[in-house]
């Protein structure tokens, strides 16, 4: 047996250990069904021998936009869409940080990162999409086939009536139809991809409704009709379930619902619509806390799930089959929590995994999709007085016009919340310009037994000044192919928290699998105006000898514009305390004091970080052996950034005190507030070692 086969068997064994007996039984049955479906595969050779022609019966598309919608799009938003569309006509498009220049005639199977091309004729359920050696970087391959570039081109046609955009959409779609027949190749291996693709197809047809060639591209083309049915048959037959029912099941249900409403052309359409609506409503509630925070505790996926939920809800409403008030209430909570978490630059937290997934693209791509989400939510559920005010964009105007009305949602906060107790997320922040923004993590590890998109980041903090990352969450960087990097970016030492005895708080069993979950709880959250204080603890080190509990308190003094961080650890253990900085921050270390500086308009930013003197501190940047000192601005990208690492031993009753003070010219430092706890001199620093 090959090494890869042995590794694969090991993965299956570890994965099965995270499942219930019922899920194991269902997955066995699912594998049997997948094998039994192999005769249903349609190859490209078979497709070439088949003359599909036109459908046997007349089909119509009625889910169109109201007259005058295009004229409502702001001029600046229109300009951005057309500029991006013109670049696309030249073959230029960025996918997950990679600028592609080959999109005049795209190769749907080629990975632009590795240059590898997966087998387009292989039966989908025999494609090992997790193997970078066989398919390349599968996220790159999948991303293009979500067809977001075609929804953008369709939007450009809708706003300009320029024939070039519509013709390019038609060329690419017909290419995709031909190159990706049913169950052939990598684009039929994951239901989330099919769900997103169906949403894109519905909106492409809608945006091109007045283009003379659109009916020949869709309902008069038997292959196009068959592709739309194939996608829905797949989603009905192979849903995500059990410990995998995270954002994937939301995308699958949303895509099925959108397609069955927009293309009700098949005998199964009504059943697909009912089932997908029930599934979506159930899973939206399961996947989000009542506060609106996503249970995956991965900020980027909260935006993604909200986009999918709104896209499906709008489609259902327009088709005359609205979703329940409970679902709209939860979507409203998701929007309110999103509005509350953004910093003064409208940047979201960077908690957990991020793959920049997009539910629907009707605008020029942006690095930060959250302002667009709020603009859409403003149209659909209404903004509250305390919300930030992002500018209207093409997507919010167009989707809002299609929705037709604004929904009233219940139980909305009268002022901006700073604590989401059910999710263990608390924000300590100042008001006015040059905002100090601090996210504190004191909640569950992640969602479901594998917590696929969680990081080992309990009690970590993320601190920004005027929207600039100071103490930064390093991000995600990669999913497949670079296991050492994947493990690092998820690890405890990669976050602004404490690691004990060289172990992460939660134990990793695979790139999307955690075996043991550190559970954190908030002990106290107090905000009396000038002072805000947060205290939480976690049990991730209860299995050590002796058992250990890590408790952290963070105090924001708004008057002195400073943060104090106090770490208390039960049990005598080796400790590594890490502080990671954003790529804009320069750090100079002098024993246990670090001088921080960064560029900003006017006077450069500056801060002083007083570190626990009982630890031995070292400064790192862009190191690979071992990995340390990196920041990932997005999936597939990493840049060097400073990291401070303190090493030592701690015993009970010996807190580690850290103070971050933001400096302003002419303002004297304020003395450190008394915490009512003993000093930390009883910790001992170890000998200097070569390893980090």
Give the predicted meaning of each segment.
Residues 145, 252, 334, 422-424, ...:
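Residues that flank catalytic or metal-binding motifs in active/ligand-binding sites
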Residues 32-132, 139-144:
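Extended, charge-enriched "interface" segments that sit outside catalytic cores
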Residues 120-122, 128-335, 339, 347, ...:
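Aromatic-lined, polymer-binding surfaces characteristic
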Residues 256, 338, 428, 567, ...:
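A residue-level signal for conserved active-site and pocket-lining positions in enzyme catalytic cores
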Residues 449, 471-482:
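Cytochrome P450 core scaffold surrounding the K-helix E-X-X-R motif
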Residues 1-57:
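Membrane-proximal basic amphipathic "stem/tether" segments
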């Amino acid at each position: 047996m090959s090494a890869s086969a042995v590794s694969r068997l090991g993965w299956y064994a570890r994965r099965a250990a995270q499942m219930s007996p019922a899920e194991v039984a269902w997955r066995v049955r699912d594998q049997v069904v997948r094998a039994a479906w192999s005769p249903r595969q349609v190859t490209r050779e078979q497709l070439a021998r088949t003359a599909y022609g036109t459908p046997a019966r007349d089909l119509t598309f009625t889910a169109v936009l109201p007259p005058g919608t295009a004229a409502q799009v702001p001029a600046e938003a229109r300009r951005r869409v057309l500029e991006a569309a013109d670049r696309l006509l030249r073959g230029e498009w960025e996918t997950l940080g990679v600028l592609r220049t080959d999109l005049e005639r795209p190769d749907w199977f080629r990975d632009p990162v590795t240059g590898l091309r997966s087998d387009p004729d292989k039966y989908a359920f025999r494609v090992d999409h997790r193997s970078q050696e066989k398919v390349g970087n599968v996220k790159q391959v999948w991303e293009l086939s979500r067809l977001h570039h075609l929804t953008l081109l369709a939007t450009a046609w809708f706003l300009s009536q320029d024939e070039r955009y519509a013709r390019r959409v038609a060329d690419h779609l017909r290419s995709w139809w031909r190159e990706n027949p049913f169950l052939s190749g990598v684009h039929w291996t994951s239901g989330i991809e099919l769900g997103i693709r169906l949403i894109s197809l519905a909106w492409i047809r809608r945006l091109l409704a007045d283009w003379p060639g659109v009916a020949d591209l869709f309902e008069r083309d038997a292959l196009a009709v068959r592709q739309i049915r194939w996608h829905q048959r797949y989603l009905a037959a192979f849903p995500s379930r059990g410990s995998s029912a995270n954002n994937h099941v939301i995308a699958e249900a949303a895509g099925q619902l959108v397609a069955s409403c927009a293309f009700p052309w098949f005998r199964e359409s009504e059943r697909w619509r009912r089932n997908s609506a029930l599934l979506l409503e159930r899973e939206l509630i399961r996947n989000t806390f009542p506060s609106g925070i996503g249970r995956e505790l991965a900020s980027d996926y909260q935006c993604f799930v909200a986009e999918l939920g709104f896209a499906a809800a709008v489609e259902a409403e327009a088709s005359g089959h609205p979703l329940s008030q409970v679902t709209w209430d939860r979507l409203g909570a998701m929007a309110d929590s999103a509005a509350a978490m953004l910093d003064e630059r409208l940047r979201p937290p960077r908690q957990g995994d991020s793959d920049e997934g997009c539910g629907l693209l009707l605008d020029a791509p942006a690095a930060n999709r959250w302002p667009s989400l709020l603009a859409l939510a403003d149209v659909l559920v209404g903004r509250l007085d305390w919300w930030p005010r992002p500018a209207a964009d093409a997507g919010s105007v167009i989707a809002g016009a299609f929705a037709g009305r604004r929904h009233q949602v219940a139980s909305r906060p009268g002022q901006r919340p700073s604590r989401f107790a059910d999710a263990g997320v608390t924000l300590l922040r100042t008001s006015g310009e040059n905002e100090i923004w601090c996210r504190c993590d004191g909640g569950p590890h992640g969602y479901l037994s594998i917590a696929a998109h969680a990081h080992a980041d309990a009690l970590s903090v993320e601190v920004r000044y005027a929207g600039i990352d100071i103490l930064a969450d390093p991000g995600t960087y990669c999913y497949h192919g670079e296991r050492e990097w994947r493990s690092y970016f998820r690890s405890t030492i990669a976050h602004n928290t404490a690691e004990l005895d060289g172990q992460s708080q939660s134990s990793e069993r695979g790139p999307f699998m955690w075996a043991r979950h550190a559970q954190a709880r908030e002990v106290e959250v107090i905000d009396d105006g000038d002072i805000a204080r947060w205290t939480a603890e976690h049990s991730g080190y209860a299995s050590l000898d002796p058992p250990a509990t890590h408790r952290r308190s963070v105090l924001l003094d708004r008057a002195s514009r400073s943060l104090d961080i106090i770490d208390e650890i039960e049990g005598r253990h080796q400790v590594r305390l890490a502080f990671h900085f954003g790529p804009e921050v320069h750090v100079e270390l002098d024993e246990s004091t670090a001088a921080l500086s960064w560029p900003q308009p006017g006077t450069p930013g500056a801060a002083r970080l007083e570190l626990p003197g009982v630890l031995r501190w070292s400064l790192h940047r862009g190191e690979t052996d071992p990995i340390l000192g990196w920041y990932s601005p997005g999936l597939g990208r990493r840049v060097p950034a400073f990291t401070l690492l303190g090493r030592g031993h701690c015993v009970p009753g010996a807190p580690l005190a850290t103070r971050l003070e933001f400096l302003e010219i002419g303002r004297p430092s304020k003395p450190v507030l008394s915490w009512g706890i003993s000093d930390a001199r009883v910790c001992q620093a170890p000998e200097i070692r070569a390893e980090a």
